[in-house]
Amino acid sequence: MKVHEKVSELIGNTPIIHLKKFGINVFAKCEFLNPSHSIKDRAAFEMIKDALDSKKINQDTTIVEATSGNTGISLAMICADLGLKFIAVMPESMSLERRKMITLFGARLELTPANLGMKGAVDKANEILLNTPNSFMVSQFENISNKNAHRKNTALEILRDLDNELDIFVAGFGTGGTISGVGEILKEKLEKVHIVGVEPLNSPLLSKGEAGSHKIQGIGANFIPAILNKEVIDEVITVSNEDAINTAKELAKSGLMVGISSGANVFAASMLAKKFPDKRILTMLNDTAERYLSTDLFA
């Protein structure tokens, strides 16, 4: 009998599905099947585990993080699983379903004015850190454990499940953890692999140096994260809000209930499939559509 004692033991080893409708050689890794239904479970667990192992935190530490969504939900789940206190700070403009998920896990939620954006949330998180004894900021955009979660696990799962046969890897980037961690290992193991980054058409920061507002939550953070390894990215494809949302809706018609950034990833992969029909392409299905009930995905 194989049973698990901790929710964190359920993270990873997500299956890969063949998306024939979007290209004969297009495949996707189903990260929405992680326990809190997003790829961020991987990084959240690794960041907390490494902090515990290195004695940066203990069972009495209060974890603090400024977050706009999935990372906050994943951290709330991990902290609940491990018996840690967690305070999430997010702009009040974030969706109601995100707020409710975080508090459902027992975390404390602090909202900041919408007009201050993520900077306002970061400033408030730093204030809480200063005023809370034995507290720790996760700092997902700078925390190398974020990237290492994908080096140690995600990338190796991909190589194992595809028998080391992959030509193109496609991923959006928010913190940069997934594309950097997976990309670094794939580059080490597969001589000719091509790594493609996906960013919003309305915020082509890496490809054109321009930042703007967009509707593809989870990618396009409007700044270059410290852990993003630009050296592993061979090409960047921009995807419009409409194409990302419409592709997510098409995925739903195939039975895959995924979010907007997953739509962006699959749209980019389908474009590459038309250009390179004989190449094996893998992308990521990052999270579940249920996280977007109040967005244009359900309009």
UniProtKB/Swiss-Prot annotation:
Catalytic activity: O-acetyl-L-serine + hydrogen sulfide = L-cysteine + acetate
UniProt keywords, alphabetically: Amino-acid biosynthesis, Cysteine biosynthesis, Pyridoxal phosphate, Transferase
Modified residues (N6-(pyridoxal phosphate)lysine): K40
Gene Ontology MF annotations: cysteine synthase activity; pyridoxal phosphate binding
Positions of pyridoxal 5'-phosphate binding: N70, G174, T175, G176, G177, T178, S261
Reported cofactor(s): pyridoxal 5'-phosphate
Pfam families: PALP
Gene Ontology BP, a term: cysteine biosynthetic process from serine
Pathway: Amino-acid biosynthesis; L-cysteine biosynthesis; L-cysteine from L-serine: step 2/2
Documented EC number(s): 2.5.1.47
Keyword Transferase carried by entry: yes
Keyword Cell membrane: no
CDD domains: CBS_like (cd01561)
Family membership: Belongs to the cysteine synthase/cystathionine beta-synthase family.
Protein name: Cysteine synthase B
Lineage: Bacteria, Pseudomonadati, Campylobacterota, Epsilonproteobacteria, Campylobacterales
